[in-house]
């Protein structure tokens, strides 16, 4: 074959390889670095990507996301990421400020709640801040599954080489989450009575309780982390008595004496739930803590004779 023809063949082959080559990220073997803001999203993303990508918390374990203020070293970390997964509906507003101040203000962002039906927010502080939705969607199995599917789909667009693996892993994870809920519901002989009323210390648990067909009758705190005034506390206790509320759900290790006052004055039974927002990050954290939450709600219903 003439040398000129060999060159043409080589050029055509090189062009074909370039057209068929996977995205640069897959080509050089580099794994995606995915930033997350909250513990549930670490679990979601870790179970979706397996060993195909790296999951990086934006804030270290031990910080309260409700009180967190961005630090320089945490903002700098965003420059090492390829994408950030957000709750995006009010629970991680700090991330928007961090991204805007980082080396990558245009970094791709996945809003996990894009397809989740949202509940209205409660409390004066929420209304005063202009927030009209409850951001605690991760405390619902149903909403979590929707978020997992959204995250897997969007990650697949950024990393096509691993898109099938992400979808497969998301389905397996969703199956386990459904099994958690099904097991909890199966332990109830019947649905709670229509007049079975519950209250919560703050507005985090509406999504969880709706899994059992329960509506929250009263919320004690005006907003998450803001203790009620003495007059507000008295009004709440009177309301719990008048409405014959049987159960109040608090938060594990909730550091407040007024919870005991409510329990003593109103006669309600107190049960503690996890907000899944503290401690170490791990792939299994969400399943472990949600299993305990579901067990607690089942026990509350059974012990109240509902």
Q: Which functions belong to the PLM regions below?
A:
Residues 1-13:
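Bacterial N-terminal signal peptides that target proteins for export
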Residues 8, 15, 105-108:
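N-terminal targeting leaders only when they are immediately followed by extended low-complexity/repeat-rich tracts
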Residues 10, 25-26:
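Intrinsically disordered, low-complexity regulatory regions of eukaryotic regulatory proteins
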Residues 21-23:
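N-terminal signal peptide c-region/cleavage motif recognized by signal peptidases
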Residues 26-306:
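Extracytoplasmic metal-acquisition and chelation regions
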